[in-house]
């Protein structure tokens, strides 16, 4: 019985630990701390971009702008706004998102056409909430400690209960071998008054025991004869 309890408590401890760790991980991922970096040109109007030069002069500029830069640590997402004032208004109100890979510089494609510029960019930094993880870990440790203390208490209490049960338990033996319980001490008058009754009861018990022995002997003899 004690081994079964230990196994059940061990399984409960493992389940509590796994549930606590997974819940902490999911909570840290679903509740990230978002920090925003304000841009200097967020509230100001976008500066006019000079008209594109000749294709020959635009080629080195396009190469210079499209050169690979170091990847920023955060993902910057904004709405594209065309800087050229002469463009169609339908293009400037586009709701497609672009990714700002670096500084807000005018970019040109291979054909010398201007690319949309992200006027307002917000950087979202995803970080784990360490406070929540600490709280969850502390709760899990408390639960495990309580279960361990309860398990040790039951382990210490189990031998005492077993001793008490063994002390109260009396093995059932054959009725023929059972000694007659000692009669409590009574007065001589009561003994003399009950002497006849006790003798009669004793004779009846002896007679009944003899009958039981004979019946058992006959049954055993018949059983051996049948075998």
UniProtKB/Swiss-Prot annotation:
Localization: Membrane
Membrane topology category: Multi-pass membrane protein
Highest taxon in the source lineage: Eukaryota
One GO CC term, this protein: lysosomal membrane
Keyword hit for Transmembrane helix: yes
Intrachain disulfide bonds: none
One Pfam family, short name: Tmemb_9
Entry keywords, A to Z: Membrane, Transmembrane, Transmembrane helix
UniProt xrefs under InterPro entries: TMEM9/TMEM9B
Transmembrane segments: 7-24, 135-157
Assigned protein family: Belongs to the TMEM9 family.
Protein name, per record: Uncharacterized protein CG1161
Organism: Drosophila melanogaster
Source lineage: Eukaryota, Metazoa, Ecdysozoa, Arthropoda, Hexapoda
């Amino acid at each position: 019985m004690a081994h079964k309890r230990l196994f059940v408590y061990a399984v409960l401890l493992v389940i509590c630990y796994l549930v606590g760790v997974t819940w902490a991980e999911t909570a840290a991922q679903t509740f990230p701390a978002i920090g925003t970096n304000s841009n200097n040109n967020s509230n100001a109007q976008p500066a006019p971009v000079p008209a594109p030069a000749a294709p020959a002069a635009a080629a080195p500029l396009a190469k210079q702008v499209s050169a690979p830069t170091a990847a920023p640590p955060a993902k910057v997402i904004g709405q594209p706004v065309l800087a050229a004032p002469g463009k169609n208004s339908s293009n400037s109100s586009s709701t497609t998102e672009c990714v700002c890979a670096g500084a807000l510089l005018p970019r040109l494609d291979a054909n010398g056409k201007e690319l949309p510029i992200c006027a307002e960019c917000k950087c979202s930094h995803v970080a784990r909430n360490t406070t929540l993880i600490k709280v969850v870990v502390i709760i899990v440790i408390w639960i495990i400690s309580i279960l361990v203390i309860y398990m040790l208490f039951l382990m210490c209490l189990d031998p005492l209960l077993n001793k008490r049960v063994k002390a109260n338990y009396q093995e059932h033996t054959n009725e023929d071998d059972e000694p007659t319980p000692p009669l409590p001490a009574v007065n001589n008058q009561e003994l003399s008054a009950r002497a006849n009754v006790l003798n009669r009861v004793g004779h009846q018990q002896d007679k009944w025991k003899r009958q039981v022995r004979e019946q058992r002997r006959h049954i055993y003899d018949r059983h051996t004869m049948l075998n």
